[in-house]
Amino acid sequence: KINQGVIYLDNEPLTHMPQNGELVEASENYLRERRSKIGMVFQQFNLFPHMTALQNCTEAPIQVLGLKKEEAEERALDLLELVGLTDKKDEHPTRLSGGQQQRVAIARALAMRPKVMLLDEITSSLDPEVVGEVLNVIRSLNKEHNLTMIMVTHQMGFAREISDRVCFFYEGKIFEQGPPEQIFDDPQNERTK
């Protein structure tokens, strides 16, 4: 729950809805519709273990968006190609490496056609040799798609490379924020230095 302020997505409040010229706490239906525009990729992948990579990417579009199976599969195959895993479409998560599972999780989130992607420490549980695979997918998304990404990471070089804005958090609060050049080259706060 937001403690203070209002978050907007597409110029509409995310957790509140307009009513009689004021913002009031949003109804469950309003929240559900707004949440469907946000994709989330977790640190631990959270793939459905009983489903193949392809099925992991088609379940939500079929169940939530009401897509026909064929349409959802076509979209999922395009996304698996984007993350370099078309050849793994029929594999279950237990047969995939950590980096491959994370790339399927990214494709699954993208299958919902989000406006915003939340990426929570998506490389922290990966072996160092596969971190690059996942970062390359994020680089590609950053360059080729008009997609806002909010990423929690300890990969400072990567954050500097792809970000247009960096927020440094300490004890749950924003300590300093600004363009990457400012945060990394000329931080204003002692803690950030």
Residue spans of the language-model regions?
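Helical segment within the ABC ATPase nucleotide-binding domain
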Residues: 132-144
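Short coil-to-helix segment of the ABC ATPase nucleotide-binding domain corresponding to the Q-loop/switch region
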Residues: 51-59
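Conserved signature/switch motifs of ABC ATPase nucleotide-binding domains
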Residues: 91-94, 112
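ABC ATPase "signature
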Residues: 177-178
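H-loop/switch region of ABC-family ATPase nucleotide-binding domains
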Residues: 153-154
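Catalytic Walker B motif of ABC-type/P-loop ATPase nucleotide-binding domains
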Residues: 117-120
